[in-house]
Structures are given as structure tokens and as C-alpha cells.
Amino acid sequence: MGRVRLASQRHRVRIAALQILFEVDETDHAIDQVLERRLTDEPMSAESAEFLRRLVFGTWEHRSYLDRIIEEAAPNWPVNQMPGVDKAVLRIALFELLIDEVEKTPIKAVINEAVELAKEFGSDNSSRFVNGVLGTVVTRYLAEREANEE
């Protein structure tokens, strides 16, 4: 499988994760039911489904920690007042950057994906906001890893 096709599949999985997490956060629907409904409605490869499950459940499980990181990086923007799309995009990206031990997606790829999701689904300012928050987090927490990826 080529890199472009894999990247495109990963992008679709991240879109699904964003939509699931947004729905669960905004409606209090049960996360496992929303995820399974999505997998039934939009079948995907076993590898993509596993990635989706890891993103959704991992991000949701660690959301309190991820929200603290967001608030440290953007102290003027309380998470509970943040647009739902921005919050979900940031949570997913931070889960990938700080917690997910399986993928170890390169920092630049995670940031680029998050910015693209913010452009696709957020407001006019979402992509700049997401990029700024993630840049701050990388500087504070991941500078050594970023240098090693260069």
C-alpha cells in the first residue's frame, strides 16, 4: 500500500474520530454505541478500525489530562468555552503526540493533520488556533523528540 493511500485512510479515520468525539462530547451519547454505529455505517479495514478505536477510546479516556495541557498552552481559552470542533481536534492531536505509544506518528504529520481537520470542520480561525496551541505544546513537552525527528 502506498504512502498516499495510507495517509488518506488515516485522514478519514481522524475525521471519523473527530465526528465521534464531537458527538459524544456535545450530546452525552454513549461512546461505544456511537463508535460501533459509525463502523457499521462506514465499514473500513481492520487496521483502520483498530486505529479509530484507539484514537476514540484513548482520547476520551485521557480527556481531563489533555484538557489541562490545552489550558496550559492557551490560558485565555478555557476548554469548556472552546468550540467543540477545536476541542476535539486538539484532544486527538495531543493524544497522538503525548500518549499513543503504538503509532508514534511524526510530530509534523500530527500537526498537519490537526490543522487540516480544523480547516475542514472548524471556524475561520480554528486552524491558526490549533496550530498555535500544538506549537506551544511541542515546544514545552516535545522539543527533544522533535529535534530527533528532523
UniProtKB/Swiss-Prot annotation:
UniProt xrefs under InterPro entries: NusB-like_sf, NusB_fam, NusB_RsmB_TIM44
Pfam family, one: NusB
GO MF term (any one): RNA binding
Gene Ontology CC entries for this record: cytosol
Keyword Transcription regulation: yes
GO biological process: DNA-templated transcription termination; transcription antitermination
The entry's keywords: RNA-binding, Transcription, Transcription antitermination, Transcription regulation
Coiled-coil spans in chain: none
Family: Belongs to the NusB family.
Listed HAMAP family: NusB
Biological function: Involved in transcription antitermination. Required for transcription of ribosomal RNA (rRNA) genes. Binds specifically to the boxA antiterminator sequence of the ribosomal RNA (rrn) operons.
PANTHER family: ANTITERMINATION NUSB DOMAIN-CONTAINING PROTEIN, N UTILIZATION SUBSTANCE PROTEIN B-RELATED
Protein name: Transcription antitermination protein NusB
Species this chain originates from: Chloroflexus aggregans (strain MD-66 / DSM 9485)
